[in-house]
């Protein structure tokens, strides 16, 4: 497998947003997110993201095809619902980087691309003066009816990267899941690493 992984910034991010939107819709449709993606919402969300100063999109290319992507930007440029749990606990978000989605098509998993995504995002965070990074992962019950029998959570991978769950630090985000008529609120657990 010959995959090129590289960070995109500025105008390069804008050029890759359609690919990122399609990847989000495709990858997040699966468990544990079960996201019923909406192209209009994706365009708005990603345009906001691309406008954030110091944002980076790390893309994985198989030839010219984007097969994976991961995003990061300073937490202070994220929406209030992402910042609020930190601010409520008195955590300074001015030197905190938020790692957004990390999406990779299934055929490309298990080849070190996830590590490359973290390496590039962490490097951008350090370049921008951050002393910590965080991300949020959806919380699902162990007996969730949509959970595949062979599902393997990423907790051990994240822990090997130096990230840990921050107890009681969660956000609530709403999205429409497959089979539902309306959005429902989901709990997102924050993981964090300092350096």
Task: Report each predicted region and the residues it spans.
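Short hydrophobic/aromatic beta-strand element in the GNAT-like acyltransferase core
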Residues: 54-59, 69, 101, 188-190
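Conserved acetyl-CoA-binding loop-helix of GNAT-fold acetyltransferases
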Residues: 101-104, 110-125
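Conserved acetyl-CoA-binding loop of GNAT-fold acetyltransferases
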Residues: 154-168
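Conserved GNAT acetyl-CoA-binding A-motif
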Residues: 96-99, 118, 125-150
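Helix-loop element at the rim of GNAT/NAT acetyltransferase active sites that forms part
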Residues: 21-37
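Active-site rim helix/loop that mediates acceptor-substrate recognition in acyltransferases
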Residues: 33-62, 71
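Conserved N-terminal entry element of GNAT/NAT acetyltransferase domains
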Residues: 1-18, 22, 26
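Conserved acyl-donor/pantetheine-binding loop and adjacent beta-alpha core of acyl/acetyltransferases
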Residues: 69-102, 145-146, 151, 169-184
């Amino acid at each position: 497998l010959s995959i090129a992984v590289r960070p995109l910034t500025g105008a390069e991010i804008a050029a890759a947003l359609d690919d990122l939107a399609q990847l989000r819709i495709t990858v997040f449709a699966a468990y544990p997110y079960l996201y019923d993606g909406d192209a209009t919402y994706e365009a708005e969300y990603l345009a906001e993201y691309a406008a954030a100063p110091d944002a980076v999109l790390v893309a994985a290319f198989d030839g010219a095809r984007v097969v994976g992507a991961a995003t990061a930007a300073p937490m202070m440029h994220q929406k209030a619902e992402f910042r609020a749990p930190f601010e409520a606990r008195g955590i300074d978000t001015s030197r905190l980087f938020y790692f957004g989605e990390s999406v990779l098509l299934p055929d490309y998993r298990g080849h070190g691309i996830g590590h490359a995504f973290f390496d590039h995002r962490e490097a951008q965070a350090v370049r921008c003066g951050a002393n910590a990074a965080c991300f949020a992962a959806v919380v699902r019950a162990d007996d969730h009816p949509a959970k595949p029998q062979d599902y393997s959570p990423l907790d051990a991978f994240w822990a090997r990267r130096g990230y840990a769950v921050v107890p009681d630090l969660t956000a609530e985000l709403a999205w429409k899941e497959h089979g539902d008529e309306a959005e429902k609120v989901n709990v997102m657990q924050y993981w964090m690493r300092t350096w």
